[in-house]
Amino acid sequence: MTKEPCLRVFGIPLSLAAFLVAVTLSPGVANAASSISGTITFDGKAPALRPIAMDADPACAKKHSGPVANEMLALGTGNTMGNILVWVSKGLPAGKTWPAPTTPVTLDQKGCMYIPHVMGIMVGQPYKILNSDGVLHNIHTLPKVNPAFNKGMPPTLKESTTKFDKPEEVFHIKCDVHPWMSAYIAVFTHPFFSATSTDGKFTITGLEPGTYEVTAWHEKLGTRTASVTVGANDKKTQDFKFAVPSK
């Protein structure tokens, strides 16, 4: 019996080449290549905030050689803003789901501070809590949707892992031992979120073409929203500004 000739494309059998092309061009793979990025800035003269006082616990105070900056307003060069959470709040494909990463989001207790101060996590993603200080801390979450937990972490407990089972808007985390310790977290069903460092920059990748509402959040100054339309393989820029409300 005569075998049919096997055509080859760049050394790859045609049947395999066709399969690879089909996978490459399939919706949700080829299309999910757009991004939205930007910079968050503070508009106006920044208010002077008192440094964090840790005198109540000498073990904490000794971990710092000088004043500890208040995290409520974390500014960089040119008044760029850290500790801003940015996410896609509307416009994602209805009914689409995204698997939770197995890589944990980590909250460290270091220098008697929560690091990072602001973060996002996906539903079901591991949430690793570290105690790098060697002093007593506790993690007291204040959600409205997920079950709250209040977990003591003595010096001997260096690590604990949990997760959140439901999506939830930003909520507060505090330490009952050290009242100045504060953090914020939001729980998402999707991976389209980013938290800024003091350079104020954020990037949200892996978006399909469409029009999205993007929200930027600050713990005291509230939210800013913008509508952003992206095309295929598009890179859009959307900046945000925050300011102290006029009295």
Locate predicted features.
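Bacterial N-terminal signal peptides
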Residues: G11-P27
